[in-house]
Amino acid sequence: MPIRAKYVHTNLIAREWKRLVRFYCEVFGCEPKGPERDMSGAWLDNVTSLPNAHLTGVHLRLPGYGDDGPTLEIFGYDQLIESDLPTANRCGLAHIAFAVEHVDHALQALIADGGSEVGSIATTKVEGVGTLRVVYARDPEGNIVELQEWS
């Protein structure tokens, strides 16, 4: 029997977390939820297995959800480890997705606020679901964001 669980957040570690928070608020209408976090101490070192870990950031309420919905947690560590730019076929977390009214407009807003395109807009029919217009893009820090429009 499965454990009782509730999905609560997705975490993005950012080089400039305040800039990334602004991006998700301005482009997607996310809103800060709760206080700004400033965390450190033995408990965080134990959880992360990183000595002297210190992180700051905030949770963002996602569009389409109320106060009890999942959040996008955007944090920055004092010490970061750089990695290659994410690709769509990389093992592990690959992208986050937003359903939007108009993919074209959403993509332009994303680009205007510092994001970029990964591929081009495509349309396909998904049997039993509908028609999907979709594109992959990147936020200002290179994380892949899927924009999808269903009809």
What do these predicted ranges mean?
Residues 16, 63-65, 78-80, 101-103, ...:
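Short loop segments at secondary-structure junctions
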